[in-house]
């Protein structure tokens, strides 16, 4: 009995609501967006919520305006240098891990890489290690093949005591 009453109330409400909208001439507004929402949607697409929207990027514009065609790509409507940008290293959206740099499209550790020591393109001399971003830092020696040795510290010996001298003259008499 209760479900019949609820169904009847819902049907009456629906019919009255439809009649009201038809009489007032609001038939079309049931499926439209409010003017407030329209203005906020328009503001969001044009100003990016207060920040200026980046210029539209077409792939051929990036290639013409950048240093070379191989370097510039259109990623998320921005022209980026994919050979040096750590957020777009070689490909759009390929990010380098923390503390790695993008050098010629590869994610490298400039603290240990001898080809990119300290910065991209800084190559260490042959055989010199790259440590802490410096070529040859704490290297054993500047000359290959020779090891740097610390001089051994020798304490000065005390002078011999007069009692400890041997008398060799006494032994010669025999």
Swiss-Prot record:
InterPro entries: Stig-like
Disruption phenotype: Increased embryonic cuticule permeability. Altered cotyledon development. Cup-shaped cotyledons.
Family: Belongs to the STIG1 family.
One of the record's GO cellular component terms: extracellular region
Keyword line: Developmental protein, Secreted, Signal
Leader sequence segment: 1-25
PANTHER family attached to this UniProt entry: STIGMA-SPECIFIC STIG1-LIKE PROTEIN 3, STIGMA-SPECIFIC STIG1-LIKE PROTEIN 4
Function per UniProt: Endosperm-specific cysteine-rich protein that acts downstream of BHLH95/ZOU to modify the interface between embryo and endosperm and mediate the separation of these two tissues during seed development. Necessary for the biogenesis of the embryo sheath, an extracuticular endosperm-derived structure at the surface of the embryo. Required for the separation of embryo and endosperm, and for normal progression of the embryo through the endosperm tissue. Required for the formation of a normal embryonic cuticle.
Organism: Arabidopsis thaliana
Gene Ontology terms describing biological process: cuticle development; embryo development ending in seed dormancy; seed development
Region (Disordered): 140-174
The protein, known as: Stigma-specific STIG1-like protein 4
Localisation per UniProt entry: Secreted
Extent of Basic residues compositional bias: 145-157
């Amino acid at each position: 009995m209760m479900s019949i009453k609820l169904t009847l109330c819902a049907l009456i409400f629906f019919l009255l609501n439809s009649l009201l909208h038809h009489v007032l001439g609001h038939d079309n507004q049931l499926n439209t967006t409010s003017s407030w929402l329209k203005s906020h949607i328009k503001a969001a697409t044009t100003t990016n919520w207060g920040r200026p929207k980046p210029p539209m990027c077409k792939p051929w514009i990036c290639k013409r305006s950048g240093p070379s065609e191989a370097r510039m790509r259109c990623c998320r409507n921005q022209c980026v240098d994919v050979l040096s940008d750590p957020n777009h290293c070689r490909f759009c959206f390929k990010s380098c891990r923390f503390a790695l740099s993008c050098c010629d499209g590869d994610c490298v550790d400039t603290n240990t890489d001898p080809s990119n020591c300290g910065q991209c393109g800084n190559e260490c001399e042959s055989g010199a290690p790259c440590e802490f971003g410096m070529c040859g830092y704490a290297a054993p020696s500047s000359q290959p093949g020779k090891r740097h040795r610390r001089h051994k510290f020798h304490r000065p010996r005390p002078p011999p005591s007069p009692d400890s001298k041997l008398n060799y003259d006494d032994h010669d008499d025999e």
